[in-house]
């Protein structure tokens, strides 16, 4: 059973008590508006905090402490949900009943120490740690170009949402990493602690009351401002001509990424129909893009669609031979037009709904997915759970899917070609 409660001003806990698992999970998430001027710094903060605290000043002592806690794991979190950047920690730990002694409480104490009592040097973060994590972050950002599918999608989003917060990458931009100083990063950290909304997620055998009591004690030193910075996502709307962008690189396979506006975001009445549409169109192995564009016509090495539920955007990603790019684009649009006209077979329709319902059922048995879903809902200002979404999907009709398709409008096309020809 899921219970939500406010523990401190601007700090809310979602607790799911269950005995399904041998381990519990917990995450702490600081909600920030996705802005280029702070995105890279926000991405750095959790990694720097995990380098050392007052009691465990280096990685070796942190690892030793986690070993003492029956091999508990702690990691950094950097997520992008619409136009909200979420940073913080997650932890997995064995249940007290299986360990035969308290594990949850000392794990929470240790997380509190890592978060609130970092190792400092001259009143700010340790320079060695900051510079090391800057290199790691810069390498992670620079490596995006190595995955051409991800790169093409990123370039599409930058064009489609130019001038909007959504265009900012999850980890920030490469050129914003090098100027970060220990002093500036520490000041940003203090601001994030005080001025951000905080969402906590727990899943395990403890009652919500026990979890709340422990966390209120651990977070009693968390600074809280008089007001917290608002976060949210502006829905993408279509009212312009289709934009085209092309790049050339030394690649052997072309990439075709197409961005559409959906006119619908999570929480709206039509959202379940949009989910079914996405699955019919390109969201699975029974979809039109897979069975027809890829399998029957052999136009793509892969072709799939996905939606950003908080932004109102659908993206089609495909890998295509250079000489088939135009034909593939035409066929992808033709399949969407078939959806608009209600040309959806019984098999496509039922398979899509069954796939979505099965996926939601599987997610209910995955602490990580439940955490990600719950936090994504909070970032969108929504409260409903997966069970509510499943009921909505069950009620979707074929006519509603066609209507959802008619609201989907092509906005931007990004093409990646080779350097020759």
Whereabouts are the PLM-identified features?
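His/Glu-rich zincin catalytic helix
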Residues: 1-69, 173, 186-292, 329, ...
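Short, polar/flexible loop-turn hinges at active-site or ligand-entry regions and domain interfaces
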Residues: 52-55, 96-100, 117-126
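Short, flexible, solvent-exposed loop/turn segments with mixed acidic/basic and small polar residues
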Residues: 78-81, 186-193, 304-307, 402-406
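Short, low-order "capping/linker" segments at domain edges
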Residues: 139-143, 240-253, 358-367
């Amino acid at each position: 059973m899921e219970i939500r409660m406010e523990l401190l001003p601007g700090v809310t806990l979602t607790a799911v008590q269950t005995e399904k698992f041998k381990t519990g999970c917990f995450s702490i998430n600081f909600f920030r508006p996705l802005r280029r001027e702070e995105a890279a710094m926000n991405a750095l903060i959790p990694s720097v905090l995990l380098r050392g605290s007052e009691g465990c000043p280096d990685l070796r002592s942190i690892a030793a402490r986690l070993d003492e806690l029956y091999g508990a794991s702690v990691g950094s979190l950097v997520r992008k949900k619409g136009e909200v950047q979420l940073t913080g920690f997650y932890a997995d730990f064995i249940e007290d009943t299986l360990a035969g002694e308290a594990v949850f409480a000392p794990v929470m104490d240790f997380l509190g120490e890592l978060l609130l009592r970092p190792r400092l040097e001259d009143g700010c973060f340790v320079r060695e740690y900051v510079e090391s994590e800057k290199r790691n972050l810069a390498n992670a950002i620079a490596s995006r170009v190595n995955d051409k599918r991800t790169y093409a999608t990123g370039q599409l989003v930058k064009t489609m949402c130019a001038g909007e917060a959504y265009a900012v990458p999850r980890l920030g931009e490469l050129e914003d990493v090098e100027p970060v100083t220990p002093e500036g990063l520490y000041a940003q950290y203090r601001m994030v602690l005080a001025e951000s909304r905080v969402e906590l997620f727990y899943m395990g055998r403890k009652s919500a009351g026990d979890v709340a009591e422990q966390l209120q004690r651990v977070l009693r030193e968390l600074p809280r401002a008089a007001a917290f910075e608002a976060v949210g996502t502006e829905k993408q709307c279509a009212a312009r001509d289709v934009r085209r962008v092309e790049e050339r690189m030394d690649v052997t396979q072309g990439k075709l990424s197409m961005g559409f506006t959906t006119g619908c975001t999570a929480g709206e009445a039509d959202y379940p129909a949009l989910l079914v549409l996405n699955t019919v169109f390109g969201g699975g192995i029974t979809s039109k893009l897979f069975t027809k564009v890829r399998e029957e016509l052999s136009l793509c090495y892969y072709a799939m669609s996905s939606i950003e539920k908080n932004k109102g955007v659908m993206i089609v990603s495909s890998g295509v031979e250079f000489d088939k790019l135009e034909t593939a684009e035409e066929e992808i649009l033709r399949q969407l037009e078939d959806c608009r006209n209600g040309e959806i077979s019984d098999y496509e329709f039922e398979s899509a709904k069954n796939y979505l319902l099965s996926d939601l059922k599987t997610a209910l048995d995955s602490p990580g997915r439940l955490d990600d879903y719950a936090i994504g809902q909070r970032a969108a200002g929504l409260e409903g759970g997966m069970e509510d979404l499943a009921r909505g999907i069950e009620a979707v009709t074929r006519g509603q899917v066609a209507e959802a398709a008619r609201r989907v409008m092509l906005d931007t096309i990004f093409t990646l070609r080779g350097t020759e020809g």
